[in-house]
UniProtKB/Swiss-Prot annotation:
The lineage of its organism: Eukaryota, Metazoa, Chordata, Craniata, Vertebrata. RNA reader protein, which recognizes and binds specific RNAs, thereby regulating RNA metabolic processes, such as pre-mRNA splicing, circular RNA (circRNA) formation, mRNA export, mRNA stability and/or translation. Involved in various cellular processes, such as mRNA storage into stress granules, apoptosis, interferon response, glial cell fate and development. Binds to the 5'-NACUAAY-N(1,20)-UAAY-3' RNA core sequence. Acts as a mRNA modification reader that specifically recognizes and binds mRNA transcripts modified by internal N(7)-methylguanine (m7G). The keyword Cell inner membrane does not apply. This is KH domain-containing RNA-binding protein QKI. Residues 87-153 form the KH domain. Keywords: Cytoplasm, Developmental protein, Differentiation, mRNA processing, mRNA splicing, mRNA transport, Nucleus, RNA-binding, SH3-binding, Translation regulation, Transport. It comes from Gallus gallus (Chicken).
């Protein structure tokens, strides 16, 4: 009906969906202009991330996504504080990383347990600190007395007596599941923690999901008709330089210039009959190098001896004028009279 809102089903918890939510939260926090403006949007995003993590955690530990009843009775009586210690079996399993299993990547597993059970969960005792030097320095100091005890998990809760007992019981059951080591290849909780760490670092890639570009190319290849063609012809290798042009070279041009003049300096009678070709005004080189085209008049700047023949030895020309020395002293009339 018009005006009624259709109830949409929430997406199922999956690593890909959790990665999208984490990317949206990271994008919102990276924008300073929008930080603190969309309060309801940030709250809904945090609630959805908590829901997906909770469902994935329950699916990992309990083997199903069925939610346990979280209903609590009404509070009766004053607020009390209850606590319980669960010692970690370090002596039985000395090589197992119980602290990392309980806390999770960046403390996400412990925070998820606290949000689900309503209790505060802390790892205390020897080996609870990552920095061993700092642990030795704090040993024996006030508020650090727990370092003298064995490694344990401290669970505390504050609520009414009837409600606190239920919360504490649920938290103890969940923590006991974490204190049971699993085989190396069968630890589903460790796989989920590594997946969450990869999502936080931005390096998570789902092996079942292909990249969009690859999927599109595969789909296009499957739908397009396949045409069988012959092998491509093998082309000869490209030449390093262009071949010699078919036009005339420079030697016929030089011969044409020399034959156009008689030995006595008069023009050849056939020069006026034979019209010059289109290449008569240019010097053409056989290869395409830059700056190779020049006017042909540059050759005529130098006089050709009438008796000179192409390839013959040029005769020496005696010059009778006196060469002027560049540093020759100029003698004027007054200096010639005095003899200086």
């Amino acid at each position: 009906m018009v005006g009624e809102m259709e109830a949409k089903e929430k997406p199922k918890p999956s690593p890909d969906y959790l990665m999208q939510l984490m990317n949206d939260k990271k994008l919102m926090s990276s924008l300073p202009n929008f930080c603190g403006i969309f309060n309801h949007l940030e709250r809904l995003l945090d609630e959805e991330i908590s829901r997906v993590r909770k469902d994935m955690y329950n699916d990992t530990l309990n083997g199903s996504t069925e939610k346990r009843s979280a209903e609590l009775p009404d509070a009766v009586g004053p607020i009390v504080q209850l606590q319980e210690k669960l010692y970690v079996p370090v002596k039985e399993y000395p090589d197992f990383n119980f602290v990392g299993r309980i806390l999770g990547p960046r403390g996400l597993t412990a925070k998820q347990l606290e949000a689900e059970t309503g209790c505060k969960i802390m790892v205390r005792g020897k080996g609870s600190m990552r920095d061993k030097k700092k642990e030795e320095q704090n040993r024996g100091k006030p508020n650090w007395e727990h370092l003298n005890e064995d490694l344990h998990v401290l669970i505390t809760v504050e609520d009414a007596q009837n409600r606190a007992e239920i919360k504490l019981k649920r938290a103890v059951e969940e923590v006991k599941k974490l204190l049971i080591p699993a085989a190396e290849g069968e630890d589903s909780l460790k796989k989920m923690q590594l997946m969450e760490l990869a999502i936080l670092n931005g390096t998570y890639r789902d092996a079942n999901i292909k990249s969009p570009a690859l999927a599109f190319s595969l789909a296009a290849t499957a739908q397009a008709p396949r045409i069988i063609t012959g092998p491509a012809p093998v082309l000869p290798p490209a030449a390093l330089r262009t071949p010699t042009p078919a036009g005339p070279t420079i030697m016929p041009l030089i011969r044409q210039i020399q034959t156009a003049v008689m030995p006595n300096g008069t023009p050849h009678p056939t020069a006026a009959i034979v019209p010059p070709g289109p290449e008569a005004g240019l010097i053409y080189t056989p290869y395409e190098y830059p700056y190779t085209l020049a006017p042909a008049t540059s050759i005529l700047e130098y006089p050709i001896e009438p008796s000179g023949v192409l390839g013959a030895v040029a005769t020496k020309v005696r010059r009778h004028d006196m060469r002027v020395h560049p540093y020759q002293r100029i003698v004027t009339a007054d200096r010639a009279a005095t003899g200086n």
